[in-house]
Amino acid sequence: MSNIQENENKETCNIKENENKEILKENFKNKEKQYFSSLRSPYSACRSVDCFKKLYTINEGAFGVVYCAQDKETEEIVALKKIKMEREREGIPITSVREIKVLMELKHDNIVQIKEIVLGKNINSIFMAMEFIDHDLRGLMEVIKKPFLPSEIKTLIQQLLNGVSYMHDNWVIHRDLKTANLLYTNKGVLKIADFGLAREYGSPLKPLSKGVVTLWYRAPELLLDTEIYTPAIDIWSVGCIFAEIISKEVLLQGSSEIDQMDKIFKLFGTPTEKSWPAFFKLPLAKYFNLTDQPYNNLKSKFPHITDNAFDLLNKLLELNPEARISASDALKHPYFFENPQPRDPLLMPTWPSSHKKT
């Protein structure tokens, strides 16, 4: 990939009024319209992508391509995420506006930080410059030979819950937590990334999109087609991640939504009026011919973990979202206070970068 030559007179972004209007035609929610309007002033002084030297492509996903790049002025290495615009006729995709808004507002050690918005040659070329992090947890677990030690697992889950608790305290649901969206620095710090599906929520709860969260990490209430859901959907994903870090295998690998739900029932048992009263009111519940399977078989998959570790895992993977533990309560669980204690992040293992240079 050729390097972009640095312009002697550093370019700045100068969005014209009619371009702003074009962007704002997007069918945003009122709060998001207001937020994007507030970005017009910062955009007028944002830097050009010419200020960065693209080194290699990290990955390409549904919402954009991510490059490893170097700031030509400071020589700092950053992750440069180009927002996909191919199908957008009326401005920036709503998912990208939400991601920018959320990342600008959330400031936490366990959440990836956005540094600035960067523009290309025209309004349809927009980048987010974010802190560069060496690994994603999924890729790392695929290449390391040894599993994480119990103290290291405890540190990773504690950091994950710290980030999730902070998100939920600030009225944000991530809606796509999985090991591939967790980054791991060479200083032993875990960071939550990829906020393309994140949404702010409020009280009372309002209907939200159902088609969220990668299938293997999707909570049962979402699989049963509910539109009214809570941050508990993120907690289910945390439970799946916890199990995956322990075993280095994805816990529930369904081939479809029906198969995923079937695997959940086989592992955790079928719900009853007592264990999950609202289950029978969910849109797709009536289509399941439930065989009576009252037993939770999760312990059989993790026979060697401590009782406290299993208890926390079980509370994170509670079928009934109303009974599922919160992130803040999970951080107070005895699991984090028994031996071995969580390992200091500075003593966590490190590895060469797992990003493939393409």
UniProtKB/Swiss-Prot annotation:
One of its GO terms (cellular component) is nucleus. Keywords: ATP-binding, Kinase, Nucleotide-binding, Serine/threonine-protein kinase, Transferase. It is an enzyme of class 2 (transferase). The active site is at D176 (proton acceptor). It comes from the Eukaryota. PROSITE patterns: PROTEIN_KINASE_DOM (PS50011), PROTEIN_KINASE_ST (PS00108). ATP binds at I58, N59, E60, G61, A62, F63, G64, V65, V66, K81. GO terms for biological process: protein phosphorylation; regulation of cell cycle. SUPFAM superfamilies: Protein kinase-like (PK-like). This is Cyclin-dependent kinase 11. It comes from Dictyostelium discoideum. The gene is cdk11.
